[in-house]
């Protein structure tokens, strides 16, 4: 972990946005299983109920990102848990993930709009963007997880 990352994590802890937490392999595998189920369900409804597919892909991304944090002894602890989770996951994963994390953060904002503003519906283009982002993110993070903890049960690539 580089010094900038450590400084960010220290700052987030002081602000009450990040806490230390250990998680065992069973818990991490349960999160990964849930992410896999969300992705499977999203693929089933994709093209039929775009908003539902979008949210399922999003939930899977969030669960995978939480695994990354927990593997590093961290968890979000604030009113912006999703934002914090993606921010910290991107920092842990490194600079080659930053473009994907920026895309996920934009999609997170769309998801919030959709959730809190019924006029902000999610359409086919947003769902496809979420699918391709989820696919790319999982395929990259899967490799990271394989190297980091061989006890994890990793589902197939999207």
Region spans (language model):
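Terminal alpha-helical segments
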Residues: 1-158
């Amino acid at each position: 972990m580089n010094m900038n990352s450590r400084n960010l994590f220290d700052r987030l802890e002081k602000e009450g946005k990040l806490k230390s937490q250990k998680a065992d392999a069973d818990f991490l595998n349960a999160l990964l299983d849930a992410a896999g189920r969300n992705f499977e369900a999203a693929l089933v409804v994709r093209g039929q109920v775009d908003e539902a597919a979008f949210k399922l892909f999003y939930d899977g991304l969030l669960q995978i990102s939480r695994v990354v944090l927990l593997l590093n002894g961290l968890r979000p602890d604030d009113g912006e848990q999703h934002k914090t989770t993606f921010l910290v996951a991107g920092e842990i994963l490194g600079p080659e993930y930053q473009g994907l994390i920026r895309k996920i953060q934009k999609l997170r904002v769309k998801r919030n709009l959709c959730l809190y503003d019924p006029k902000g519906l999610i359409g086919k283009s947003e769902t496809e963007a979420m699918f391709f982002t989820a696919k790319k993110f999982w395929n990259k993070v899967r490799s990271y997880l394989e190297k980091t903890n061989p006890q994890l049960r990793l589902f197939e690539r999207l």
